[in-house]
Amino acid sequence: MKEAHRKLLDLATRKGVLISFDPNLRFSLWDDEEALRNAVLEFLPYADILKLSDEELEFITGRTDIEAALPQLLQGRCRYIIYTQGKEGASLYRKGECITSKGHRVDVVDTTGAGDSFIGAFLYCLLKEGNGDLEEISCGQLQNHLDFANLYAAHTTTIAGALAAMADQQELEAFRHSLELDDDFDDDD
């Protein structure tokens, strides 16, 4: 299986495909944590975008401070580190810049799928925008993308079940209004 992943990633890299990597660590599926760490480290160099949580940051880098880990992570192809911190929000790091989106206070029912919905929403924004050069995207655009992803993930936690919690645009807009947010995610700063 690992060889198939490597071949696919090599092909995607040659074709210029944007690669996002969320390690989404599942310790229960591995007999050996060191083997898991080595597998993650083997695939890190393929990522243009790396999404990490607190637990993943420490496991992969041995550090608990994202700022201290950046030089280790922002190298090779990697252009963005997205660091999610649950209810505290998320930050996007790229060389010399940090963009932060505060978390939303919601009544949490189930956190299953929150990280997946976050990165899915962020990638949706990138694809919708159509800008293939990650370094050319403005801080304002990235702020909008991060805010949208953060809102989407917050919504996901308010409903039981990962798939049942996936919102369409109308549901997300109603959720945004229920939080009394006046931000508009259509700005192209």
Language model feature labels by segment:
Residues 10-11, 64-189:
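Conserved phosphate-binding/catalytic region of the ribokinase-like
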